[in-house]
From Swiss-Prot:
Protein name: Ribonucleoside-diphosphate reductase large subunit
Positions bound to substrate: 209, 224-225, 255, 436-440, 618-622
Site entry: Important for electron transfer: 762-763
Catalytic activity as recorded in UniProt: a 2'-deoxyribonucleoside 5'-diphosphate + [thioredoxin]-disulfide + H2O = a ribonucleoside 5'-diphosphate + [thioredoxin]-dithiol
Disulphide bridges, residue numbers: 225-453
Gene: RIR1
Family the UniProt entry places it in: Belongs to the ribonucleoside diphosphate reductase large chain family.
Active-site residues per Swiss-Prot or TrEMBL entry: 436 (proton acceptor), 438 (cysteine radical intermediate), 440 (proton acceptor)
Amino acid sequence: MASDAFMQTACPADAAEQLEAEHAEWAQLGCGAVPPPPAAASRPSRAAVAAYVGEVVDRMRAQSRADERVYVKCGQLVHLRVRARSVPLDDWLTSAELALVSEVAEPVRANRAFVEVSLRYFELTEYATLRALGLQSALKYEEMYLAKLEGGAIESMGQFFVRIAATAATWTMREPAFGRALVGEGATWCAVFNAYLTALYRQLVVPATPIMLFAGRARGSLASCYLLNPQVSSSTEAVEAITTEVARILLNRGGIGISFQSFDRAVSRDCKRGIMGALKLLDSMAMAINSDSERPTGICVYLEPWHCDVRAVLNMRGLLARDESTRCDNLFSCLWVPDLLFDRYLAHLEGREGVVWTLFDDRASHLSRLHGPAFTAEYERLEREGLGVETVPVQDLAFLIVRSIVMTGSPFVMFKDACNRHYHMDTAGDALTGSNLCTEIVQRASPDAHGVCNLASVNLPRCVREGEGGALAFDFAALSTAAATAAIFVNAMMLGGQYPTEKAARGVARHRSLGIGFQGLHTLLLELGMDMLSPAARRLNVEIAERLLLAVMATSATLCEYGCAPFEDFARSKFARGLMPFDGYEGVVLSLPRAWARLREKVARHGLYNAQFVALMPTVSSSQVTEGSEGFSPVFTNMFSKVTMSGELLRPNLPLMRALRKHFTREASRLGAVRALDREQWSVAAALGDLAPGHPLAKFKTAFEYDQERLIDLCADRAPFVDQSQSMSLFVTEPMDGKVPASQIMNLLVYAYKKGLKTGLYYCKIRKATNNGVFTGGDLVCSGCHL
């Protein structure tokens, strides 16, 4: 059907009627400027309704700055536009553009009556909550996640959830233990489908972006993160790895972390450009593949800081690039830092003179396989024997690292020894070599098998219930149920997923690594009336992480109890010796010691189906559909503003806006507070003055207003219960002179190192002193682990 023909057909009657009802509600908000919609009695066309919604949203969304109700109403209108463009279930099932695979379409047809009842229930009940989330949520669904069909049609919200739930249910039924663990004995497709559907449309479980885009469809990979360690040592080997493995993963929209540490030949007659020639090819490939994609992905190159080309990599982006032949603006880098570098930097800070750092070439390649005391001993032996290619004062290298971070947004920083120390396998003599694009996945990658992680997150603000006296309280039972559901859901997606390369499929089969995280921590705390750094918030932060790990690990053990084989290396893992992830940390106090004791016994008897469990990823995209804060980070502004081709897009911090309305009972006072906030870049403290700690508005701080060391403390507090890692970003405000002191960033990295974290820095977000702009040295947009 031609696009014009479909859009000129009559809009569904219920959408046109709802549009008239919405117009009456606009009037109640005092928005007399909203034009009347096409009359429902005239059966307006889909195109007319879509055009009307676009006109009203464009006209009214600027008022979201002062009235959160307008923001919500604009979102509800966008959902009506989605309804106007939707098609019946039969057309959806047979859409060539959607391309549902038969394994998913056939169970939906076979259980059509149940599916239709489920859809109807969603539309009559839960959809109202989802429609009321806000404009950003509605636009993100419409523009990115809802599949585009023929003739300008789009899948409905209900069909979107059905597609994902049906895919998960179909593959769950292929493994009896999955269904039994999810819904009990005698699991049926309908029961499993309903469990997933409910968790999805209530936004308790939020899948990763690849799953939302490609679940049930004949294209795309469902995995989020790929870790590669091709162990290349020449340009020829690098080109082969890039054009085979890397290209195929990028074409499937996977985010990549790739270790090039083994390519450590110094510039010579035989190797004229060192590693940079290979990185330039990688950069060009990333640009070419992303250039025609609405959903770009990315690549992060991992190196250890003793690599002979580390200076070149630190200078490959932005203003630091010497010329176009070395510019790699489409790549990110991450330093895989051994403890020795920070120990030497600390010695320099303590006054020791002449502390140096030595760079090595391929004569020291074996250092990448060592960590801890073994690395230190061998590194210092190589120094004594004079095998280094360059020696630099350690403070000079630290300055180069921080300068690159501030000016280009890269490198990220991860701590090699912490990652190896807390890994579930013994890595002595065979150390881990890198992480993924977003620094939260810690897995082994080898020349014959990639590390692969499949992700989902639990939406913490949905785990809230009314307690005694109507006060809100966190529902730990809801968290545990959501985490267990997410674990089985991701396992099902792994079972049914298609992988871009054989090495990726081999890595999945070998490790079955889960990456279950959470999002909306800051939003949750605000709803519960807590400042993010209050003692109560710190306790809740740890208990959430503990319950999440417990639920996911217990589910994995249950799968083995019900007949699944443990992951391939279980017998050689620390788990087989009775150890848990938190046992590698000192001073851990468990809130549920008996539950953990029972789990230890269960693991000893049955094993674990998965090798890894929890990873706290950035949730940039999915936090937009839930209208919550990203991952575990505080909001970085109380009024997000982005200028696009279609105008300014605003996203207010809804808990703050509602608190303002509740606190300022007179409309004039509320609007005065809003104007003051607008003048002060939406800083509550700057606009309203110093508020008492118990004041209902005092807790609405942004990430830039928090002490960054205290935010690092929150990460360290929950680290024992995060067996992979956390994408920890830092938020720094530029001084009035426009110069961020290098020592400020380096001191935060040292603090993270001393706290024993695995990820020392993902992004360093810098707020300009003169305006509310945020500079990150380059915007990474990833459809993989960014969720």
